[in-house]
Swiss-Prot record:
Tree of life domain: Eukaryota
Carbohydrate-modified residues: N55, N111, N126, N388, N542, N598
Name of encoding gene: SEMA4G
Pro residues: compositionally biased ranges: 763-775
Residue spans crossing the bilayer: 676-696
Designated name of the protein: Semaphorin-4G
Cleavable signal peptide: 1-17
Protein keywords: Cell membrane, Developmental protein, Differentiation, Disulfide bond, Glycoprotein, Immunoglobulin domain, Membrane, Neurogenesis, Phosphoprotein, Signal, Transmembrane, Transmembrane helix
GO CC, alphabetical: plasma membrane
Domain Ig-like C2-type: 567-649
UniProt function note: Cell surface receptor for PLXNB2. May play a role in axon guidance.
Length: 838
């Protein structure tokens, strides 16, 4: 649902959120599309550094020594600013001890991410030493590091007043004239504060009877030299940018607000502040804060801030990146706003807010303001009145400062509106630099880091921004944590969880023609007519000869012949009725594809079988009128560039053969089909013949085997004996009695085969068991057992023998049985038993 409502919601809020006619600008005009997309595989001129540590989020560039100092988790690195990946780097291992990690884990902290020494602060302390602070497993420590030897000292300083305990908390810090100015959440209780340490007069914000800071997350701080060329002898000031809970937008007391709405703020303190003498002792006497508005009510969370021209206060301005408020958790969008220092100064010189006890709400203070003005720095005018420092200020002024830290007016962006609203993007950090072009004008060039590892390079043009390119700087998606620009090295350094990458500030060689070079509108790039190439302005001796058009991006190449070689003519031939694709890739995301037929007829999507897509032109159901010369043009910013040229020929389709007369039913089968049928029938006949022969052969073999075996018969019992089924064993002839046996076999079936005769009549009781056989037969063999043993897998059952048909003589039964048993020893097992097993 949100995916469908989001464009409409953004458009409505963009046009109506902030009053004023200048803010009724459609969101589609503010949502700039990057002109070029450079994936990770197409990066050129980059350098990488990755050590054994993680979270390379703290960067310090020292241009004079050409060193890039990096603070990571458990380590510090000193890299060559010229090439961070040259391998000639120095490293300091600064890990938290196992005992400290164990204590951190026992306090309920995560031993996978939090219980380490995350280096959060790294600045130049003096000409010989650096100053670094780390979380040290929720026991912060700081150290002065020898810059030349790049080694840790033997002793450390406690860092609980200088560094956050939690590595995930916002932090910003500066070293100014030896004093350490930091803003973060201090101590284990995570108390937000702005503090000054390593100074004869340590200061912090007020906590009672009201908090000057409410659940603040700090983003950025900067020193502005307002004392330079000041006609009133003003003091230098430190500006802090952060997001906090807004107490003025809901009912609440001094100590607790009932509102959870978070807003962006800007605060300032004077560098020469010494605190109060009796009131606000060791507290800031110059602290003031104001709301920072970019685009309400959506964009309230401050993500990144950069300052330009901070050395000259009259030209100092800031760029800030905002994301959606915390209640919009399912949407991603960012806004970029610009703020002038003069506007911030005007707000701090305006009316104050006051907590009104009667209504228990914050409102505009309407009473009188004491003198000297509360929150102001000591100037020449105040010195002439005897106020040489903040400790000389009257108690009335200090009491007013204590209760009125918030200004009534908000700080609005330049021209009252954002420069950019970007959907589906979350900016995490930004930096910028002013670039003076060969023609004279100066443009602000910004580099915006995203939460998924991309860098947007943009130039500020009046009330908007033009995104020159978007570059994927990491193969894996990860957040950009820090950005630093080196003008001497012409490089951008990117800090991220996995490492540091060095990018060139410009990639002018990507643009191959004059039009492509000026359409990019990169302040660093211009077309050189002498070398017929797009070159960086910093590398050209005669910079005035370069062709540039940053404002409009379409002028300067009219008289130049460096429009690039025309594309070769490609031929395509297709049959009538077929489809054909004419490829054409647009190099710019801002270009519109334009197709012309025979140089004049423009083709649109859906017209006469044409389909215009991002990858080319599709001609469907080609007809003879589709033949001709096709040109693919890129139309961008009023310029037209030929990208591809085709000559298409549509050939007539081959006529189909005339259908034959229908064949008769008897002749409808093709000759080859008949032949297959005949062969199949012949094969089946042959198989049947082979099968019949095999069966006949097997039958003959079995008949022969039966003739050689002894014959068994199943005789019918005497009718007088009853109708029960009886089995009789008829012994075969003994050797020497073949003739007699044959005669008997010819005379009746009872003596030659085994018969099963079903019983008839009523069932009769079983006959009495036969008398036991004698101990020894007449042939000298002992009586057979009542059950024969299993031999060679065949079972033999001794059947009751009748007195009839028992052959006399010593060899009638015993010899026959011995011969059968001897034969069975050498008989192969069969799967199915036959009558020979009985």
């Amino acid at each position: 649902m949100w995916g469908r409502l989001w464009p409409l919601l953004l458009s409505i809020l963009t046009a109506t959120a902030v009053p004023g006619p200048s803010l009724r600008r459609p969101s589609r005009e503010l949502d700039a599309t990057p002109r070029m997309t450079i994936p990770y595989e197409e990066l050129s001129g980059t350098r990488h550094f990755k050590g054994q540590a993680q979270n390379y989020s703290t960067l310090l560039l020292e241009e004079a020594s050409a060193r890039l100092l990096v603070g990571a988790r458990g380590a510090l690195f000193s890299l060559s600013a010229n090439d961070i990946g040259d391998g000639a780097h120095k490293e300091i291992h600064w890990e938290a001890s196992p005992e400290m990690q164990s204590k951190c884990h026992q306090k309920g902290k995560n031993n996978q991410t939090e219980c380490f020494n995350h280096v959060r602060f790294l600045q130049r302390l003096n000409s010989t030493h650096l100053y670094a602070c780390g979380t040290h497993a929720f026991q912060p420590l700081c150290a002065a590091i020898d810059a030349e030897a790049f080694t840790l000292p033997t002793s450390f300083e406690e860092g609980k007043e200088k560094c956050p305990y939690d590595p995930a908390r916002g932090f910003t810090g500066l070293i100014i004239d030896g004093g350490l100015y930091t803003a973060t959440r201090y101590e284990f209780r995570s108390i937000p504060d702005i503090r000054r340490s390593r100074h004869p007069h340590s200061l912090r914000t007020e906590e009672t009877p009201m908090h000057w800071l409410n659940d603040a997350e700090f983003v950025f701080s900067v020193l502005v030299r307002e004392s330079k060329a000041s006609a009133v002898g003003d003091d230098d000031k430190v500006y802090y940018f952060f997001t906090e809970r807004a107490t003025e937008e809901g009912s609440g007391s001094f100590t607790q607000s009932r509102s959870s709405h978070r807003v962006a703020r800007v605060a300032r303190v004077c560098k020469g502040d010494l605190g109060g003498k009796k009131i606000l002792q060791k507290k800031w006497t110059s602290f003031l804060k104001a709301r920072l508005i970019c685009h309400i009510p959506l964009y309230e969370t401050l993500r990144g801030v950069c300052s330009l021209d901070a050395e000259t206060s009259s030209r100092t301005h800031f760029y800030a990146a905002f994301t959606l408020s915390t209640q919009w958790k399912t949407l991603e969008a960012s806004a970029i706003c610009r703020y002038d220092l003069a506007e911030i100064q005007a707000v701090f010189a305006g009316p104050y807010m006051e907590y009104q006890d009667g209504s228990r709400r914050w409102g505009r203070y309407e009473g009188g303001v004491p003198e000297p003005r509360p929150g102001s720095c000591i100037t020449d005018s105040l010195r002439s009145q005897g106020y040489n420092s903040s400790q000389d200020l009257p108690s009335l002024v200090l009491d007013f400062v204590k209760l009125h830290p918030l200004m009534a007016r908000p700080v609005v962006p330049t021209r009252g509106r954002p420069l950019l609203l970007k959907r589906n993007i979350r900016y995490t950090h930004l930096t910028g630099t002013p670039v003076t072009t060969p023609a004279g004008p100066t443009y602000d060039l910004l580099f915006l880091g995203t939460a998924d590892g991309w860098i947007h390079k943009a130039v500020v043009l009046g009330s908007g921004m033009h995104i020159i390119e978007e570059t994927q700087v990491f193969r894996e998606s990860q957040s950009v944590e820090n950005l630093v620009i080196s003008l001497l090295q012409h490089s951008l350094y990117v800090g991220a969880p996995s490492g540091v990458i060095q990018l060139p500030l410009s990639s002018c060689s990507r643009y191959r023609s004059c039009y492509d070079c000026i359409l990019a509108r990169d302040p660093y790039c211009g077309w050189d007519p002498g070398t017929h190439a797009c070159a960086a302005a910093t590398t050209i001796a005669n910079r005035t000869a370069l062709i540039q058009d940053i404002e409009r991006g379409n002028r300067g190449c009219e008289s130049s012949r460096d429009t690039g070689p025309p594309p070769p003519l490609k031929t395509r031939s297709v049959l009538r009725g077929d489809d054909v694709l004419l490829p054409c890739d647009q190099p710019s995301n801002l270009a519109r594809a334009l197709w012309l037929l025979n140089g004049s007829m423009g083709l649109s999507d859906g017209q006469g079988g044409y389909r215009v897509g991002v990858d080319g032109l599709l001609v469907t159901d080609a007809q003879p009128e589709h033949s001709g010369n096709y040109g693919c043009y890129a139309e961008e910013n009023g310029l037209r560039t030929l990208l591809a040229s085709y000559s298409l020929t549509v050939r007539p389709a081959t006529p189909a053969p005339a259908p034959k007369a229908p064949a008769t039913p008897g002749a409808q089968l093709a000759p080859d089909v008949r032949l297959l049928y005949v062969l199949a029938i012949a094969a089946l006949g042959g198989l049947c013949l082979i099968l019949a022969s095999s069966l006949l052969y097997v039958a003959c073999l079995r008949e022969g085997r039966r003739g050689r075996r002894r014959k068994y018969s199943l005789g019918r019992a005497s009718r007088a004996g009853g109708s029960a089924v009886q089995l009789q064993t008829v012994s075969g002839q003994c050797p020497g009695e073949e003739d007699e046996g044959d005669d008997e076999g010819a005379g009746g079936l009872e003596g030659s085969c085994l018969q099963i005769i079903p019983g008839e009549g009523a069932p009769a009781p079983p006959p009495p068991p036969p008398p036991p056989p004698p101990a020894e037969l007449t042939n000298g063999l002992v009586a057979l057992p009542s059950r024969l043993r299993r031999m060679n897998g065949n079972s033999y059952v001794l059947l009751r023998q009748s007195n009839n048909g028992v052959p006399a003589g010593p060899c009638s039964f015993a010899e026959e049985l011995s011969r059968i048993l001897e034969k069975r020893k050498h008989t192969q097992l069969v799967e199915q038993l036959d009558e020979s097993s009985v």
